[in-house]
Amino acid sequence: MLTFIGLGLFDEYDISLKGLEAIREADMVYAEFYTSCLMGTNLEKMEKLYGKKVFLLSREDVEQHPDWLSKAKNRNLCFLTGGDTMVSTTHVDLRLRAEKLGIDTRLIHGASIASAVSGLTGLQNYRFGKSASIPHPYESRRGTRIISETPYDTIKQNLELGLHTLVFLDIDKEKGYMTVNTALELLLEVEEKRGEGIMRGAAAVGIARAGSEKPVIRADYAENLKDFNFGKPLHILVIPGKLHFLEAEALVKLAGGPVGFMKEVE
């Protein structure tokens, strides 16, 4: 049996009682934190709470050489991830591979950043469109700096439909955790190149350390928000579409947004 367990948003105490019980009953416990991680804890604290050794897996261990998976044929294994399990396609792929090997799988869900963002900002969850991910820029073989324009396109499509866009920010082993500030700078750089008027004057909301005792939620126009200090990671970004009057009021009162938002409601 392979049990996928979502650990929630911030620290070791975000796990559900059902998830904690499954870990304590498992023969072996594995975890990956390259798709998401808990910034308010570490492996030592997790192991102390769980009463179990946790084996940390790399991207290669999960996606390319999951030799450990075969152990689940005759043992109870747990696979831990930040947030809610199965949000990442990597985890869906791993589950399908387990099923093909004849391994039974089980899911134990955890708090998701998608639902947390709605709660923290006051933006209604059914008004979100397709999400986007902003990767760090990279250099081509010729040394040209490449910025992905896919997130810009996704935001554009959602805005045309009046929908909000949840924008995930890159976690890179070498380049580190992308900030809201960097993400907005990259989107504005694409805007400067394409000149389609998507980001200039657009509203934006940044969230830092969701799930902690003192998360930071700040709303403003993108050009202003890029200069706000959100502090330590993890960060996530929202580009709102058309605002319902309750959403606009929430952004002003709960996220310090400008009163001008109240004039832009449906």
Swiss-Prot record:
Give the pathway. Answer: Protein modification; peptidyl-diphthamide biosynthesis
The cross-references to Pfam families, in alphabetical order and at most eight, read: TP_methylase
Reactions mediated catalytically: 2-[(3S)-amino-3-carboxypropyl]-L-histidyl-[translation elongation factor 2] + 3 S-adenosyl-L-methionine = diphthine-[translation elongation factor 2] + 3 S-adenosyl-L-homocysteine + 3 H(+)
Asked if the keyword Transmembrane helix belongs to this entry, the reply reads: no
The record's GO molecular-function terms, alphabetically, read: diphthine synthase activity
Provide this UniProt record's keywords sorted from A to Z: Methyltransferase, S-adenosyl-L-methionine, Transferase
Q: Name one GO biological process term.
A: protein histidyl modification to diphthamide
- Tell me which residues bind S-adenosyl-L-methionine: 9, 84, 87, 112-113, 169, 210, 235
Q: What is its EC number?
A: 2.1.1.98
Task: Return the SUPFAM superfamilies for the record.
Answer: Tetrapyrrole methylase (SSF53790)
Show the HAMAP family listed in the entry.
Answer: Diphthine_synth
* PANTHER family assigned: DIPHTHINE METHYL ESTER SYNTHASE (PTHR10882:SF0), DIPHTHINE SYNTHASE (PTHR10882)
Briefly state the protein's biological role: S-adenosyl-L-methionine-dependent methyltransferase that catalyzes the trimethylation of the amino group of the modified target histidine residue in translation elongation factor 2 (EF-2), to form an intermediate called diphthine. The three successive methylation reactions represent the second step of diphthamide biosynthesis.
State the similarity comment. Belongs to the diphthine synthase family.
Subunit structure of this chain's protein: Homodimer.
**Cross-referenced NCBIfam families, in alphabetical order?**
dph5 (TIGR00522)
Name of the protein in question? Diphthine synthase
Q: Which organism is it from?
A: Methanosarcina barkeri (strain Fusaro / DSM 804)
- Gene designation: dphB
